[in-house]
Amino acid sequence: MDLKMLLIFIAFLLPSVLGFPIQDNYENSTATTESTQVTTEEDIYDSPSPAETDSEDELIFNRILEVNKDSSQYLQEGDIVPRRSRSAINCRNCYWPQSRDGIVRIPYVLDPTYEENHVKGIREAMAEFETLTCINFVKRKTERDYLIIRSADGCWSNYGKVGGGQTISVMKGGCMWKGIIQHELDHALGFLHEHSRSDRDKYVRIMWEYISPADRPDFKKFENSNNLGLPYDYSSVMHYGPHTFTNTTGKATIVPVPDGSVHIGQRLGLSNLDVAKINRLYNCSRCSTIIDAAFGSLKSANYPRNYSDNTNCVWLIRTRSRKISLHFRAFELRTTRGCQGDYVKVYDGSSKYSTVLMDKTCGSQIPTDVVSSSNLMLIEFVTDGADTASGFQATFTSAKIQRRFKIRN
């Protein structure tokens, strides 16, 4: 094979190599996936289009089904504990109460048999809710209604608040993936699977011929579902994969319409529309955007015109197992002592509990480039009620993470 043909062959293979996703597994290591979408603050309702392959995508959802197949817990739709009396849709008391400060605090207790890495993974999954929405998971004191997160026999949850202590099963060894943990927590917040929406027939076709009679109830459509006035989300963390419950190898059970090539389902983490739905259901006024991309840009609202007073916005950048490099192209924030008024802050992770990469920064001097240690970076922009300025504009790129290995004799 001559050099020209070899280069063509490598160019053909390269996209496939780069497109292989790495999942968030808290038994081992942490990573996410990316797409080529570039998202800005104004695109809060635009969810990313996952770039992972069907087989890898379904590996995550099939993990739930595989783990749950031997579960002694009776489940609907693969991972939902059915209610004994109240309707799963028309249940006004199924939502967690909101405090006067606008925060929805949900008490929880963790299984004492969890090891340190399990606890860390569960809390990281919770922290993304707290960063992107007004949902805060807090350790239980004496509250009557709370979550019991334990390693039972499977990955499953109740729908919404049921009263008293309610179990979310996050089994060690099978369910310790960020997307799965967030999926089950989302059920507890009051969300069903995306394909159960009343308007689903406009967006997907259920291929009943490839679904066994015993599994058909798992594809039930709720005619009176509350869709919150938000679009159908193919990339929701609550969406089935295309081959879920298929009885014929290679045949899809859910096909997008009118474009059958649209990618559906993932278990990697909350999408922008997942976040928007939580905030709308719980009447949260949060400014948050998820950017799943290898490169892109972001800017303060109204840039290059002046930003608004009393702003609190975050951008969560997620890439596929790549370090993120953030470069500020323009920077003009009102100067205050210690930057206690308007500021930009950057974290080395997906929440405000993560290590700080760039502490509160204001003024007109462009900050130096910021590089994450992993595939996650959070940018926070806060302003007070005083004077404003033009704000900032930034771009980001990503590079493969270099892993170090110790050689043992």
From Swiss-Prot:
Q: So which residues are the signal peptide here? A: 1-19
Which InterPro entries does the record cross-reference, listed alphabetically? CUB_dom, Hatching_enzyme_Uvs2-like, MetalloPept_cat_dom_sf, Peptidase_M12A, Peptidase_Metallo, Sperma_CUB_dom_sf, ZnMP_hatching_enz
Residue ranges under compositional bias (Low complexity)?
A: 30-39
Query: Which tissues show it?
Result: Expressed in ovary and gonads.
Q: Which domain of life is it from?
A: Eukaryota
| Matches recorded under Pfam families | Astacin, CUB
What keywords appear on the UniProt entry?
A: Cell membrane, Cytoplasm, Cytoplasmic vesicle, Disulfide bond, Fertilization, Hydrolase, Membrane, Metal-binding, Metalloprotease, Protease, Signal, Zinc, Zymogen
State the compartments where it is located: Cytoplasm; Cell membrane; Cytoplasmic vesicle, Secretory vesicle, Cortical granule
- Protein residues bound to Zn(2+): 183, 187, 193
Domain named CUB: which ranges? 287-399
SS bond partners? 91-94, 134-284, 155-175, 287-313, 339-362
| GO terms, biological process | cell adhesion; fertilization; negative regulation of binding of sperm to zona pellucida; positive regulation of protein processing; prevention of polyspermy; proteolysis
Task: Return the EC number.
Answer: 3.4.-.-
| Cofactor(s) needed by this chain | Zn(2+)
GO CC list: cortical granule; cytoplasm; plasma membrane
Q: Which terms does the record give in the GO molecular function aspect?
A: aspartic-type peptidase activity; glutamic-type peptidase activity; metalloendopeptidase activity; peptidase activity; zinc ion binding
Q: Where are the transmembrane segments?
A: none
Residues annotated as region Disordered?
30-54
Q: How is the cofactor bound?
A: Binds 1 zinc ion per subunit.
Q: Where is the Peptidase M12A domain?
A: 87-285
Function, as annotated: Probable oocyte-specific oolemmal receptor involved in sperm and egg adhesion and fertilization. May act as a protease.
Q: What is this protein called?
A: Astacin-like metalloendopeptidase
> Which organism is this entry from?
Gallus gallus
Query: Lineage from the top down?
Result: Eukaryota, Metazoa, Chordata, Craniata, Vertebrata
